[in-house]
Each structure stands twice: as C-alpha cells, then as structure tokens.
A protein has these predicted regions:
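Accessory RNA-recognition modules of RNA-modification enzymes
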Residues: 1-311
C-alpha cells in the first residue's frame, strides 16, 4: 500500500490493511477495526514470510515510524513505488496504461540501502520524570527511544547516541524546553550540526554548548526559537550557541550553506539525481533566463545559475 501496511482481502471482498505484513506474507492477524468499506488488522504471527521480506539491520523496524519498509528488500521497495505511481496516474490522473508506460521511466536510485540520510529529527518525551529523546512510532502517540539509527549517515555512527546522552544528562539539571532536536551530518564536508528547537525565553546556553561539544564534537550548535500554537509555530530567531552556526554540504559541483530551519533533501546523492534529471530536461543555455518559482534553499537554483545567463 501507500503506507506501512500490507493489503489483503476478506472473504467478502473487503480490503484489509494489515499492520506488520508485507506483500507475499502469509500471516495470522487480529482484526482491530471493522469499517463499512475496509478493515484494519495487526499481525500476530508470520506463518510464511514473503520472498521479499528481509531481516533489517534495525531492531525497531515495525515499531519506529522512520523506516516502515525496512523489512522489505530494496528491489521490492523500488517496484512498489513505481507501481504506486503508475496506479495514481491511472486512477486519479485518468491516463491510459499506454500513456503511463510512456510517462513513467525506470527509477534512478542510489546504491545505498541504509546509512544515506544526512538529517535525523528527535522528539522529546518524559520517562520516569526525566526527558528522553526518540522518534515517532508507528503508533503516532508513542515516542520510541533509540540511541542509533542505521538510516543516518554511517560516517557518524556515534553522533546520535552522543547527542541523546548529552541532552538527557543536561535535562536532569536544566529545563531545556526542547520541542525537537535536529542533527545534520555530511560525509563530504564532515560538518555536524545540532539544532535545538525551543520556545523563546531563558536558556542555559553555555552549559548546553559545552556539554554537546564534549560529547559529540559538532561543527555547529544552534538554538531555533519558535512562537505560536504548536501546530502552527513559526521561527522567530536562530541563535548560534557554538561553532559555525550553519551546516554545509557539497552537492552538484557546488557547496551549500544552510540554516537549521531550511529545507534540504535528506538524501544528498538522491538530490543530485534529481538535479541531473532537471538539467537534462531543461537543457539550459548560457543566454537563457531561468525562473525558479519555488526555490527553497536553492537546490536547483544554484546549478541553473552555473548554466544560465540569469536566474
């Protein structure tokens, strides 16, 4: 399916979304919701695993919401994504199968199954009266506490554990007011930034920067202050606590310097494939003017600027 569940059908033809199952599995499942047009079930036992099921390198697959397809082979993941796109074009776009065949090209992907993410975000939760950091679970009401993530850049294997340990230690004696924590890492520039998202107000700046520096050796530590209701917060200020105050990444023959709130693709190699595809399609010339109507941090703007007269 488009989400995290496997899809089955009951004897009456009703669709059943099965949590914890992948396509090709034979499972025993418990029905947890019986709606008018569909049902939801939870896997209780895998009777016969799918040929596409793998043993993931992360023990939290199926619990943590960060890698819901982590127990599915890479080949099967790519095939499922292509099929989802084709299905969407036919069902919603009303394209014919022949038109879809013409539109959809083979997926171009990186070679990395794991260890490719340049960013990870953590949410705070309270465990036994103390603040703990973790990731959103498959159940969005729960936070899964972890000290490593195989999806995160493998050149920084201790970064997550070091940052989590430092902030857990600090929370024992300081009210940090953490709303979330972002960690960005680049294997190309060796940059490592820790961004602490908090409300405005007092904050133990020197203690936080010192403890994080000793634990994780980041190149940048910043505090991102936000205002407003939780669901509609806006950034009011980014405060540099230590280091460079920004994160750098080499991409597509250039270097980008990004502030913590700025959006950037979490897969640098994947972003380079996107840039390459856009440049191939546009074929920009030296005397042409390009307009980037939704430029963001400049992922496409900067490569265009190296090829066009003006952007």
């Amino acid at each position: 399916t488009y989400g995290t569940d496997g899809l089955a059908h009951a004897d009456n033809g009703k669709a059943v979304f099965v949590q914890g199952a992948v396509a090709g599995d034979t499972v025993e499942a418990e029905v947890v919701q019986d709606g008018k047009s569909f049902m939801r079930a939870r896997t209780t036992e895998i009777l016969e695993p799918s040929p596409d099921r793998i043993q993931p390198p992360c023990p939290f697959v199926g619990i943590c919401g960060g890698c819901s397809w982590g127990n599915l082979s890479r080949t099967a993941q790519l095939a499922a994504k292509e099929q989802n796109l084709r299905s969407t074009l036919e069902r919603i776009g009303k394209f014919s199968p022949d038109q879809v065949d013409e539109l959809v090209q083979p997926i171009r992907h990186t070679k990395d199954d794991w260890g490719y993410r340049n960013k990870i975000e953590l949410e705070p939760t309270v465990v036994n009266g103390r603040v703990r950091l973790g990731m959103h679970g498959v159940d969005p009401r729960k936070i899964v506490t972890v000290d490593s993530c195989p999806l995160f850049d493998k050149r920084f294997p201790k970064a997550l554990k070091s940052v989590v340990g430092a902030l857990n230690y600090l929370s024992g004696s300081h009210d940090l007011g953490l709303e979330r924590v972002g960690i960005r890492a680049s294997r190309r520039t060796k940059a490592l930034e820790v961004a602490l998202w908090t409300p405005t107000g007092s904050f133990p700046r020197s203690q936080v920067s010192r403890v994080l520096a000793d634990a994780a050796h980041p190149t940048s530590v910043v505090r991102v202050m936000s205002k407003g209701e939780k669901k509609a917060r806006r950034v009011s200020k980014v405060e540099m606590l230590a280091g460079e105050g920004s994160w750098t990444e080499n991409i597509a023959e250039g270097q980008m310097r990004l502030s913590a709130p700025s959006f950037f693709q979490v897969n640098t190699k994947g972003a380079e494939i996107l840039i390459e595809l856009v440049m191939e399609a546009l074929d920009p010339q030296e005397d042409e003017l390009a307009v980037d109507l939704y430029c963001g941090a400049g992922t496409f703007t900067l490569p265009l600027a190296r090829r066009c007269d003006f952007v």
